[in-house]
Amino acid sequence: MNPRREPRGGRSSLFDGIEEGGIRAASSYSHEINEHENERALEGLQDRVILLKRLSGDINEEVDTHNRMLDRMGNDMDSSRGFLSGTMDRFKTVFETKSSRRMLTLVASFVGLFLVIYYLTR
């Protein structure tokens, strides 16, 4: 056996333990830093998720409100359409009759009513 190799072998075995411990300490420290950074990033993501959840809830409420308003408006339009179609049917009935006497009476009554209202408000 070579005497020179034995001290190197002994020395390397001595320093191997120290280096491994140093590496282990550095890697555990690095692991703790990574864990801390991950926790901060997770908290930031959690805040964003909460904000998005609140925002989506507000959007949902706004959409529901608009849908109810549009439904009411549609119902009002349907009732107005029914009223106007009834009025148009009455006008058709009046104008389809060939009686000029009836038409003359209708026009004269409108003109007379207009004149009475005009003189009363004057």
Swiss-Prot record:
GO cellular component terms listed in the entry, alphabetical order: cytosol; endoplasmic reticulum membrane; Golgi membrane; plasma membrane
Protein topology in the membrane: Single-pass type IV membrane protein
Residue stretches spanning the membrane: 104-121
UniProt KW keywords: Coiled coil, Endoplasmic reticulum, ER-Golgi transport, Golgi apparatus, Membrane, Phosphoprotein, Protein transport, Transmembrane, Transmembrane helix, Transport
CDD domains the UniProt entry points to: SNARE_Bet1
Function: Required for vesicular transport from the ER to the Golgi complex. Functions as a SNARE associated with ER-derived vesicles.
Main localisation: Golgi
PANTHER family: GOLGI SNARE BET1-RELATED
Protein localization: Golgi apparatus membrane; Endoplasmic reticulum membrane
Domain t-SNARE coiled-coil homology: 32-94
Species, as recorded: Arabidopsis thaliana (Mouse-ear cress)
Similarity remark: Belongs to the BET1 family.
Name by which UniProt lists this protein: Bet1-like SNARE 1-1
Segments on the Vesicular face: 122
Membrane side Cytoplasmic: residue ranges: 1-103
Domain of life (superkingdom): Eukaryota
UniProt record, GO biological process: protein transport; vesicle-mediated transport
Modified sites of kind Phosphoserine: S56
SMART domains, sorted: t_SNARE
